[in-house]
């Protein structure tokens, strides 16, 4: 679901990137050091902040107003706050590019809206790797249901 959404957004972006009258906004999220907030976090480190740096340069050349959230600032609360703020800035005809360079993880679908029985989720820096009944049940993950 998230992959499809990203592909659609990228295709739309490519098709209209040279439109001169439209306002262009980008929100980029990148996490490299998943241990920065919690040394016991079991997620492997990746190169998300490098992706954000490279994509920021490209998008600014295309006239985008770029907001980036990286490392310890890439918490669930902050990502959702920035997404909400973005929805207030855009207007009809705006181009919006969303980019997430972080881990993803499937979650059992609880509301029955997924054919395959799984919700997809983004993994912010404050989300543990393991589901533990009564301790951590995915509350910091950002599921596709939340993004829809």
Give the location of each predicted region:
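Positively charged n-region of N-terminal signal peptides that target proteins for export
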Residues: 1-5
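Bacterial N-terminal signal peptides
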Residues: 7-15
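Cleaved targeting-peptide boundary
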Residues: 20-28
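Caspase-like (clan CD) cysteine peptidase catalytic core
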Residues: 21, 76-101, 106-148
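Glycine- and acidic-residue-enriched helix-capping/strand-helix junction motifs
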Residues: 35-53
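Short helix-loop-beta junction
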Residues: 50-65
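Hydrophobic anchor at the start of a short beta-strand
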Residues: 65-67, 96
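Short beta->alpha junction loops
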Residues: 68-76
């Amino acid at each position: 679901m998230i992959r499809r959404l990203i592909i659609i957004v990228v295709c739309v972006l490519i098709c209209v990137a040279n439109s001169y009258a439209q306002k262009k906004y980008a929100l980029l999220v990148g996490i490299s050091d998943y241990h920065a907030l919690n040394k016991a976090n079991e997620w492997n480190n990746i190169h998300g902040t490098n992706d954000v740096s490279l994509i920021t340069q490209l998008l600014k050349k295309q006239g985008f107003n770029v907001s980036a959230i990286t490392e310890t600032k890439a918490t669930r609360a902050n990502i959702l706050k920035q997404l909400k703020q973005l929805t207030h800035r855009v207007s009809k005809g705006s181009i919006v590019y969303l980019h997430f360079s972080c881990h993803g993880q499937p979650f059992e679908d609880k509301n029955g809206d997924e054919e395959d029985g799984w919700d997809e989720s983004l993994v912010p820096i404050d989300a543990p790797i393991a589901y533990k009944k009564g301790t951590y049940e995915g509350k910091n993950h950002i599921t596709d249901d939340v993004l829809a």
